[in-house]
């Protein structure tokens, strides 16, 4: 019988089926996510283009309505039609690339600086530089192009900020601000009009408030309204006057006139009251954005103390009623509020209503409208606009559409402004604008006439570009009124004017226009003869001689530019499975968490925050291939030649704080143009390690005891390196990994390295920018080689946690902003120079003193002057502004992260000081680019130290590791001994060699301070040695085999600083020469390189599992890595990469078995593996460069082609001597302090480990001690020895022989990408074929196999097998279940799990599924390595994991729902924009037809048609004549207006019918004149009597009981009443169809089924009776006459029903 733990075959089949279902569901959802996300991106572009088309067509309509009568309306129609078929082209494809980038720089600069834009417009208004039409075009370009027609929340916000700035600049300084509000009188008035036209919330408010009263006015057929009825009398003809009032002069005539006056005024008053009542009911819908603008204006006017209260009230009333509500009433059809054609008579009536409303609002202080205005002023006066606008995330605009003519006008506008002294902007802003404009081409004529004033700017610009390359920027230096944005100048474009490209000039040579050219000012500043940049109007004031210009402009393609707007994709990316599961575990284990210092600073309202987000476009995951994954080896080599120094920072920071002609253009060229651009392999790309503190000057940590400023973005610097490309051969020499021939002391500190040039992928940009005092008080350390090289994806959580821990415990420790190192895309996952090449390729002319001696310098202790410190939390900036990176920098929005939901649970820092459950909380994925996990996630993972009050040093304080996803590296190379007390801390010494032209005295002062710091650090060692009992921050509660061991480890007392003592002893012997003859001081580099070559993918992707992840000692560079972290049990293939390293160590141990090492180690500490050096690595907070980092290439300096001057060589020699002296001093000091810690054993251990480094066969010290010291605690040592591979003889690299990577091998490693899939198979980075023929490999494999069979390594095997088993079971299916577990299994010793896999293997072989064959075979092989009881444990674990993943499946469904909702929102937005475009075209055609019929030639035809129509009596003949005349007019219009689209033809036909039947309405509606009217009045009176007793439950109606709940069907009644407002039979019929359709939908809703005709008919009878529409019989005959024979389908059914209802009502009796 099988043990119960092994399960049975049926259970395994059921588990496999469940896993398969889960896998299929996840794959389907992920595929749907990808499809929906792609659709969102395309829809966003479509919406941007539709918004542009809508805005242009609305502008054309406005120009047509305001055009002079001598202008051809057909021209406007052709222009509008051209936009329907406009071709949108990427500007980079049509324009020269550098010109397109210059335009984008200008747009992004203006987009984020509303104050500068407002000042520009106000200056143009004040100086009258342009005509009204020209300035109107500039305003139109800004509103429709730059701000995207204000359909996006972000655009509305910036447009409101622009209006706020115009209020301060224009309205507050004016003596009569009301005059500036008049139409087209100021930029503020123009922009305000554009805003209210574009705001959809304004459209909603106007529709809710005005639709019903408007339809009420239009439904009255013969109504005449006027404030002065006497004027109406003059409009009547004598015949009409006699018909209405009788014979003039009679007494009856006077009475009729008086009654007419009273009725007119009474109707006017009643309609106005309807409007007021409707406004009161809908006032709550008033747009909050407009309300904020009004409140801001009111507040600022009152604060100015220049205007009386009455004047302020009138000005606000003008904004609301005169310029917002009143135009909507008078032109409701043009705004789309109603779809009724408004006749001239009705337009006059509406204008009278508008006048009365304005009079009430302005003059009557007791009116309801005044009270409504007072309501607007209540509430949050002065509230920031960001808090008011709806935070919608359904649409993110990343494109800007503009036609070429508008583009040229805008550029010329700013050229004109910058040339005027009256343009009152700062010098740097003017220079910045001029530089951007200088990169935009002019015409040749303009080049020749370039004024000498502009010439110096062109010459100075390259120099300033070079200076900007030296300095780093801090946008948060000071908060100024001018919201300065980022400059995205490429800095590489030619500053000489370049001829404009051909597409810009096609058809645009004519500069003469109706407004007289550009005006005197424009002509004076620059010549525009033959220029495409003449600021001509778009249609107004333009004679017909300019037709070719307009036609060519309309047919030209529309250019699409990129806006650097953040987060368009970030909010759509789903969380990974690991993230969801870890977020769920946060709440469960919250009681074990340390306090998290949460700094979720709100987003600063200024536009500076856009700079942070705009940089995100440069570091998105899709750009990794060209930016993040650029060849950082070459980048470092190139950067070494920078002549800049950190001393330049303070000189240039103030000057260049906003002058960042950065290298975005270079980066984009790398993306777009590939290697054909000047950006080969990213040499000219910026450092991908970008600090996120740009927006508000986020404060970094305290570096070297000095308060350091926020590191400026290397990406924001201009990285134009003047170094010639002739040294490309030297760069590729880095691939030759030569051996060192001996011990050579070489410094890595270069006098040409700088803190502001290209940095490596492993940098920590902690000391980029310093304050003035910081410049004086510290040495500059280069960021090119960090103190602790960080693997890609490592977020330096330890540093942040320890910096915070030092602050919590009362010591001013280095403070880090984790966002500076948080970006994942800034790590090159392909190159990994710091992993495999040890940065050996850095130009060795700058590696002055690379020492191979393992320095014993300890990390610098955190010694800070309290006076120097301005301590701030990482989430705050140096200026006291909120750090925008906290609120906005994350590419994933905060609402998408569940970490923010749990933030309030960990506020009390005193409640959680125990062990931290960080193992299940530390998750992130590769797309978290801008510190994407949010500040809570970051600080939660790295929460501070325990509250014991002891001093916590940056390295050995309470630290934490984290679990990582498959896209991240698994190990930080910091020496993390998580369960040991801190060893003595000393100052880590290093010098930053300044450039040779720097002041020598500065170096002298720096060295003096360094010595003082060293002496002070030595005094603190003994005190720091006494710090003990650091708690383990990793919660191992989810790994059962770790619990007992963890408890046992904590109970045992440990000697302090065990590993440090070991390393010190090693270094002591190295210094005294007690080493083998094979020069181990150099040879340890070989092991380091070879190991990293073997495990480069393993550390990048490999993840340990189970208890094997604890106390794992891996050597990385020269730093010891003590892993006490819980890493996720995910990628099984990645496990093998790390296991290969373990195999190496076992192989090396076999060769060194005679050493007999017996380290006295207990279970809580691991011993250094091969390659460990004595260097105690400096903390990441210092940014220091350890002296022991070696570069293989530096051993061959005599072979290099670099040249060094004598002064530099002499300085290097002196530096080396000082270094050696300090090293010896520190060694002797440590030797004296540690004599009592078993030096003999460590000496032997050191000899065993480092004896033969060149052969790369080091011994695993822990294994050696395990073999030679049987008395040692077996379980403890076993817990430390986690070296295993599943296949002892395959897949592991052996380094018994000298191993050297070939150049092709290293290049192959660079080409490989990190797999983000948990099932990805990562190949060994060095290949399986190199160096396998070692004689020691067989012994090592046998030893490894013995360890596995002995159960020494259950954690790694168990976790990997579980992952592989899940992969196999979730990808297989059982075609036949005809298998049962029998007694034969006991003879074969196979468990049911193995039986199931054997079935699957045979099935895959039978079906020839090769990938599954390999998977199943691997799973079987792995199972064979486990004990039989563990098979049952595997199944139990898989079942528990399946239950835990239910939350992930639920998350997938919720995310799918969110995406579906967002998809629908985008579709509705697109439909709305298309509807607006169609509405504009309909209004345009309507106006065109009205003007067309008003021509004298058409008037004659119309009069002739009316005469013929009057002679006909038969209805059929009249209908036929009408249709023929409409078709003739349509054909003429179609050919004249160039109507191509079928929709346009139909719209034109409807417009002609409307105009024609409106003029002949009396004749077609009442052909028998008074007889028809009398008949309608009789029926109306009859229905009025029926209304008195008819009710829904009346027995004569027989309405079913279930339908009575929806009575009285108000909307249906309204539709029938609105029939009188429409004039054409088709429109009247549509009202009837709408009425019946609404009834049907209500009946269906109440009954749940489709209602029958018998259900509908009684309800329709009741609705017609209660509505009692006017002229009912005439309407029925009118529709039957013109449409009766043309109806079909549903329309015919509804019309038949309605006709039968009218007949039934005519015969109804008045019975109760």
From Swiss-Prot:
Protein localization: Membrane
Protein's UniProt name: Receptor-mediated endocytosis protein 6 homolog
Source organism: Drosophila melanogaster (Fruit fly)
Lineage of origin: Eukaryota, Metazoa, Ecdysozoa, Arthropoda, Hexapoda
Stretches with biased composition (Basic and acidic residues): 454-466, 652-661, 883-895, 1007-1017, 1024-1034, 1194-1238
Keywords: Coiled coil, Endocytosis, GTPase activation, Guanine-nucleotide releasing factor, Membrane, Phosphoprotein
Function: Acts both as a GTPase-activating protein (GAP) and a guanine nucleotide exchange factor (GEF), and participates in endocytosis.
Boundaries of every VPS9 domain copy: 1573-1712
Residue numbers of Phosphoserine PTMs: 645-646, 834, 890, 893, 1154
UniProt signal peptide: none
Composition-biased stretches (Basic residues): 986-1006
